[in-house]
A protein has these predicted regions:
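RNA pseudouridine synthases
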Residues: 1-155
């Protein structure tokens, strides 16, 4: 599953058995553009919960569910940073909430503090999916490049 306006890869199972197997073995990597300049790599380990009074928006809170995001800088400019991201947990809006929490919201993510300059959606792409084929047992790796609207922010 991907958030609305997140681009990239999705895997659709044709049968319930395949869906059950895939849900336990699928790994995803994301590419994102955040505002500001980050260096190196890091881990964000703060819990997330549904924001009180909202039906979809999330927030960082001590009583939330554990959420862990690993990130690495792969490029950028003086205004934006291009990131490669791997989730240890898979909470709704996890990447968006975590980067907003550390003061670097995703570009275009107006729900979590990002500015809409140059992009009309959050700058987030599911760029790699890895899974074990439910019938053959072969490891499958799918990849796609980030979309042009995202890359324009870091060139």
């Amino acid at each position: 599953r991907l958030d609305k306006d997140t681009s990239g890869l999705i895997v659709i199972a044709k049968h319930g058995y395949a869906a059950a197997v895939l849900s336990k073995s699928i790994e995803k990597e994301y590419t994102a553009v955040c505002e500001g300049v980050l260096k190196g790599e890091g881990t964000i380990d703060v819990p997330i919960r549904l924001k009180e009074g909202y039906t979809i928006q999330r927030e960082v809170a001590k009583d939330g569910q554990r959420a862990v995001t690993h990130w690495k800088v792969v490029g950028g400019t003086n205004h934006h940073t291009l990131l490669q991201i791997r989730l240890e947990t898979g909470r709704t809006h996890q990447i968006r909430v975590h980067f907003s929490h550390i003061g670097h919201p995703l570009a275009g993510d107006d729900m979590y503090g990002g500015r809409l300059n140059g992009i009309g959606r959050q700058a987030l792409c599911c760029s790699k999916v890895l899974f074990v084929h439910p019938v053959t047992g072969h490891r499958i790796e799918l990849a796609c490049p980030p979309q042009d609207d995202m890359m324009a922010l870091v060139q």
